[in-house]
Amino acid sequence: MTRRLVAGLPTGTSAWRQRVAGAAAGLQVGAAVQLDFVLPPGRWVDGDTLAENTLKGLRDGGALPARYGGLDALVATKRDGGVPGVQVTTLTPKTVEGRRAPGPAALDVTASLLPRPGRRDVKRAWRSQLAAAWRDRPPLEGSLWADVAMPVSGSLIAPLEVVLDALEPVLGRDPRGRAWQEFFPNDHLITWLRVRRGATGAALRLRIGVR
């Protein structure tokens, strides 16, 4: 296990990506990583956006190969207060899998869909399955956790947007979304996210609940 602290304000910008790349010298992430973000109070940003941009910085800095090859598991957390930054911790997939979710699951759903970036039809089908599973319950509120297992062979990160963007039936719509933006859920409420690579042919699985 190796830890590396990157100070600064985590964002989805190129400036943050460059800061992470500059701090990545000598670090090798391997098959699993945990990213613990600290943000100023009231900062409104999706955890998966922070995670993806930070991983890009780690890749740029040589800590990860192209397309995040070999990365099979990720945990990303965010909290308000304290000195802004991210702590990068290298782990093993077994360690990540052994972590207990920080609360009971309000929804546990599987699907035979294979999430692919740019496939709006898949995203719509996944959203329909989530709506059917959630039924007419009110959206989840507060600090949330999500656990995603995806049967993908390529990048573990690229398909994640497809999975999370369809969560509007469960999380409600983010008021920042404009009318033309079809997918804009309140996924900024997710403060603990685990993403794992599932076996080829396995089902896509999402569990989500309140922390």
Annotate each language-model stretch with its function.
Residues M1-R211:
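Acidic, proline/glycine-enriched N-terminal capping motif
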